[in-house]
């Protein structure tokens, strides 16, 4: 079973998104493709990075997640977990960019998977 991966973003946890963004814009030479609020977090994707900003308390539940992977289908990820093991930690959930879930895979890697809705998916082009 193969999961169709559209992109993988390195997660960077920051105190203040407005302070952090200029550095990542300069680093990547790109403007933020997405910027949104989810729960108590401010998020933006710039180049290959997903910046997550919030208080120490707000970020605490997310710090153990190693990457965000954009996939064609959340259902493919669920089948992968069923076939290869792993633990569904959260989701599937409706989020501002589509649907997500978080999985701890055998070996310990914890990955957030997101299936973008059409508007968010257009930012990948």
Language-model features: locations:
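Conserved active-site tyrosine of GNAT-family acetyltransferases
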Residues: 20-25, 81, 108
